[in-house]
Amino acid sequence: MAELSEEALLSVLPTIRVPKAGDRVHKDECAFSFDTPESEGGLYICMNTFLGFGKQYVERHFNKTGQRVYLHLRRTRRPKEEDTSAGTGDPPRKKPTRLAIGVEGGFDLTEDKFEFDEDVKIVILPDYLEIARDGLGGLPDIVRDRVTSAVEALLSADSASRKQEVQAWDGEVRQVSKHAFNLKQLDNPARIPPCGWKCSKCDMRENLWLNLTDGSILCGRRYFDGSGGNNHAVEHYRETGYPLAVKLGTITPDGADVYSYDEDDMVLDPSLAEHLSHFGIDMLKMQKTDKTMTELEIDMNQRIGEWELIQESGVPLKPLFGPGYTGIRNLGNSCYLNSVVQVLFSIPDFQRKYVDKLEKIFQNAPTDPTQDFSTQVAKLGHGLLSGEYSKPALESGDGEQVPEQKEVQDGIAPRMFKALIGKGHPEFSTNRQQDAQEFFLHLINMVERNCRSSENPNEVFRFLVEEKIKCLATEKVKYTQRVDYIMQLPVPMDAALNKEELLEYEEKKRQAEEEKVPLPELVRAQVPFSSCLEAYGAPEQVDDFWSTALQAKSVAVKTTRFASFPDYLVIQIKKFTFGLDWVPKKLDVSIEMPEELDISQLRGTGLQPGEEELPDIAPPLVTPDEPKGSLGFYGNEDEDSFCSPHFSSPTSPMLDESVIIQLVEMGFPMDACRKAVYYTGNSGAEAAMNWVMSHMDDPDFANPLILPGSSGPGSTSAAADPPPEDCVTTIVSMGFSRDQALKALRATNNSLERAVDWIFSHIDDLDAEAAMDISEGRSAAESISESVPVGPKVRDGPGKYQLFAFISHMGTSTMCGHYVCHIKKEGRWVIYNDQKVCASEKPPKDLGYIYFYQRVVS
């Protein structure tokens, strides 16, 4: 490179900007690749736009924008000089002390074992004229000051990726207890010794809790595996109502573990020193002698059997490197994202759409490619498939490998993709753990929005569902079709093969709890896959069905079949459900999924000879005997508590009152409960509850339900507001006509997500309207030429499949735990566990959560 002259620097001086507080500085990662300052060519940061580019792409930005001056940042890593453990020569590995990722004391998945030598230069394109950061001394003061200010501001500014991380996930963020400042403490308490404690009701000498009201020392709860305590502390609370207890052995001058039985959570007690002194305990003199609850939970998570099996822990696995074997760094509970995109980019359609067309996508990228969906997805796909980032982690720039990291690769960190895909979303924009199935559907939706009328890789998953409803009173039927992307497979626990073992386990567990002894070894239910498939296809009774043949309520049965079979069948095992108390829980179940799958028997047949269709008559919107002014519930006029001006019209819908009452009693807002029942079509409490759980974070969650053509509070009809053009375009890109898109949006108060649901559930009505258009004087040719065929494009073929990939979840809830995926590549199973990519020795196919089957083509 030639040396930068004063004249050259003066020529670009007007384009050099000093970043301000609101500017996004992309100094960690290239906008088009995963090159970083540690890459061989370093990173070039535009000193005008503050976008970062690798050596391969910096000229692309120069040619597109004309920006010539860049800050070239290059870092070389070297091992940190640390104290070594005695006799081993290895640095001591820090043990996590917090149930968190990415915060001090938490799980550090990218532990910083290195220090960096940094080389900073100013470079002017296209000739790559350069001057070192410390070589500005000979320039005129005004030039030197301007350039130095810009350079220092760039180097000291928080990077865009850091700003986008709203917060690192912390599973032990604790709130101040409501009892902390007014806790009642009994007079004349016993003095508590500084050590030698024992439960006052049994012989336990660990996991002991001091009640801060009366000074009782009692053992803690029993854990699911039988360890822990004998529940004496919680039993004492039930008897006395004394709410706060501190765990003995965790008290230090910095604090202690405090639990509130009333609030059922770990809490903070700002008055802890005062509360302890009441019993003669000097907090400043105490030392830690027992594990904190966080440490115990971390230990439990790391040794629980499900985690061991799914991650294939304890088995030496061969690391894999090269194209298609690139790991993804965990950005703080982003394993759900990592698992989903690894599977998607193992599918040829996604490779063709984004990776094969990489150059075209990059050429058409806007000035700021970090905000372009197609660019960031193409960048992600190339990063995973190119092999450029799938190499063993290196110790330094000389290429020496790190011995203790030989099974780990640097991989890629998709920060820009995560920020863009989660932008504006109440959940995916955070660093909290998420449901992989929900993220899969969110990503599918984003692909739909951005593909418009171009090639759409989502077609590999899309299929039509045929639903048949049969009125039992008249034997007449109605067929409808809807689009779906996932087959949700129920788990019939009553079909478990080891019922006797399960009953025996439950009895032993009950006896152990009564006798306060360790619990027996866990027994996992073994449910045949065939039983799950039978449950999916089994008829479902529909009570209070409005029969258009009877013009009255009747009982019907609904059966679900496939109207088409997709190229790739996605099966979600419905492991996550709600208990009788509506608390989310995960079924601990083993289902031996078949390698070869044939679901041909689930293909729908459509209207059969001899079947008579139900009349296509819209049901009345209120029952004939319903009092005027009611909400349209199946109820009576005594339900005054449910009255609302928004539902006083005689055109109010019929809503199942019992379901609404159930949801309201669980603490959800009345208006949200009404919407849940309305948008799920009175299909029962479970469907309404699922709607509530998936829409809780919507900005309008608790807003009143405004029906199509009705007026909201203080507003005109929803139809008066024209649907947003971008929403119309999105629906049109999915294969519907503009008129259909407008109608769907108006019917759902201009909500894009609900409009898509609405249009899929009204395909038959849209077909009828299209036919009516023709019968009213429009020729078939005119109709075809002026509108797009109804419904999105689906592929169809035989219903025979082969298992291709599966995503597994470890933990008790989708809101916590960890995800990994297994993918079959080149005839072998491969496990993708964030950055670690290895050949799988024993893929746990019976414990998966989401399965991906590929059609077998004969």
Curated annotation (Swiss-Prot):
Source taxon at top rank: Eukaryota
Knockout consequences: Conditional knockout of usp5 in T-cells increases the production of effector cytokines and retards tumor growth.
Residues in UBP-type zinc fingers: 175-283
Region (Disordered): 73-98
Domain USP: 326-856
Record PROSITE patterns: UBA, USP_1, USP_2, USP_3, ZF_UBP
One of the protein's GO biological processes: regulation protein catabolic process at presynapse
Any one of the GO CC terms: presynapse
Modified residue annotations for Phosphothreonine: T292, T623
Compartments, as annotated in UniProt: Cytoplasm; Cytoplasm, Stress granule; Nucleus
Active-site residue list: C335, H818
Modified residues (Phosphoserine): S149, S156, S779, S783, S785
Molecular function via GO: cysteine-type deubiquitinase activity; ubiquitin binding; zinc ion binding
Reaction catalyzed: Thiol-dependent hydrolysis of ester, thioester, amide, peptide and isopeptide bonds formed by the C-terminal Gly of ubiquitin (a 76-residue protein attached to proteins as an intracellular targeting signal)
This protein's UniProt keywords: Acetylation, Cytoplasm, Disulfide bond, Hydrolase, Isopeptide bond, Metal-binding, Nucleus, Phosphoprotein, Protease, Repeat, Thiol protease, Ubl conjugation, Ubl conjugation pathway, Zinc, Zinc-finger
Glycyl lysine isopeptide (Lys-Gly) (interchain with G-Cter in SUMO) cross-link, chain position(s): K113
UniProt cross-references to PANTHER family, sorted A to Z: UBIQUITIN CARBOXYL-TERMINAL HYDROLASE
Subunit structure: Homodimer. Interacts with TRIML1.
Protein's name in the database: Ubiquitin carboxyl-terminal hydrolase 5
Organism phylogeny: Eukaryota, Metazoa, Chordata, Craniata, Vertebrata
Underlying gene: Usp5
